[in-house]
Regions:
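Conserved N-terminal phosphate-binding loop of PLP-dependent enzymes in the Aspartate aminotransferase
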Residues: 122-123, 227-228, 243-247, 251, ...
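Terminal RNA-binding accessory module
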Residues: 246-323
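Short glycine-enriched, charge-decorated loop/helix-capping segments at active-site entrances
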Residues: 66-67, 167-174, 246-251
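Conserved SAM/AdoMet-binding glycine-rich loop
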Residues: 86-212
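Proteins enriched for Cys/Gly/acidic motifs involved in redox and nucleic-acid/cofactor modification
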Residues: 1-101, 139, 154, 175-193, ...
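Conserved, mostly hydrophobic/aromatic
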Residues: 77, 94, 128, 156, ...
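Structural recognition of alpha->loop->beta junctions
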Residues: 1-6, 111-123, 146-151, 217-230
Length: 323
């Protein structure tokens, strides 16, 4: 038995990998899909619509751990959304491993799914937990921004703002395509004096071969072009069996730590700018049931947390507020 202190978290995964060397595991059952939804809160539910991934990004073991992309038919998902609505829940977050790849195993597609979910009575708001930029089509954006129940909240993996690193990661887009997608969403969604779109962006720092100059391409791309409301920052971690793990040009941990801090500082700056850009804007808030020291919280459509004095009359209700 090994015990790790709070400062030794980086040793946990290598230690586990060392212990399981030589242990064989079966992939039996990875072709199954087990639909599920959670309803721990009275206001929001997470509905799993997809599992697995067919992408083979050079740093990732998810396709091997979770199997190929798969899902159940839309005809079986709609009743789950209806059951959620019957519990009085008004917001659903769609989840999956590669959510936008929905339909590969049933001959359908993600656009088919969201259009049918939009018609479920009782559900007033939808969020997409994460979607690959190449799977978020202009046709889909046009529909989402036409007055549907889908909110102006996008979680999109970028991973790197440097084309050299994107190619070496095995990603399926370049920075020009990514920037064009972000700009298109803003053009279709935002009006003067109205809410700004929330973009949450995933970024990996310290991928093998990422020099200081290449990292700064990512930094400047985020700061000057994408300008997200939030950056989810992950230091690259070697995964046995992946092409990236075998590379000799690994980045030192101390360099990764420095780059993470730089992006955390940038994230704080960009998030503050996002909040200021929404100040004075009217938005709808769905209040949650939790009593936090006499206060209750809820989120606007563009994912700004709003607090007010606790009042059970507001639980599960959508009300307009001025930010």
């Amino acid at each position: 038995t090994e015990v790790f202190g709070a400062t030794e978290k980086s040793r946990i995964v290598p230690s586990i990998l060392e212990k399981v060397k030589g242990i064989e595991c079966s992939d039996k059952g990875l072709g199954n899909f087990f639909p599920a939804y959670s309803s721990g809160e009275r206001t929001r539910s997470f509905l799993k619509v997809q599992d697995g991934c067919d992408y083979k990004c050079h740093y990732c073991t998810v396709p091997y751990a979770r199997g190929e992309s798969r899902n159940i038919p839309i005809s079986e998902i709609i009743p789950q959304a209806e059951a959620i609505a019957a519990e009085g829940i008004k917001e659903i977050v769609l989840t999956g491993v590669n959510t936008g790849d929905f339909g590969r195993s049933t001959g359908e597609n993600f656009f088919d799914l969201i259009r049918q979910l939009n018609d479920v009575e009782g559900i007033e708001r939808y969020r997409i937990s994460s979607i690959e930029p190449n799977l978020l089509t202009e046709e889909m954006i046009d529909w989402i921004t036409s007055g549907t129940k889908f909110l102006p909240h996008y979680h999109i993996p970028l991973q790197s703002g440097c084309d050299t690193i994107l190619r070496e990661m095995g990603r399926r887009y370049d920075t020009a395509a990514f920037a064009s997608k972000i700009e298109y969403i803003r053009q279709k969604s935002e009006v003067p004096g109205g809410p700004k779109v929330f973009f949450g962006i995933d970024v990996i720092v310290g991928f093998p071969g990422e020099t200081d100059e290449l990292f700064m391409e990512t930094y400047n791309f985020l700061k000057d072009v994408v300008r997200p409301a939030f950056i989810h920052i992950f230091p690259y971690s070697r995964r046995a069996g992946t092409p990236a793990a075998e590379r000799k040009d690994q980045v030192q941990d101390c360099v990764k730590t420095k780059r993470v801090q730089m992006l955390e500082d940038l994230c704080a700056q960009l998030h503050q700018e996002f909040l200021e850009a929404n100040t004075g804007v009217e938005e709808s808030v769905l209040f949650e049931s939790t009593d936090r020291k006499g206060m209750m919280e809820g989120y606007t459509g563009n994912y700004i947390r709003i607090s007010r004095p606790y009042d059970p009359e507001f639980i599960g209700k959508i009300v307009n507020v001025t930010i």
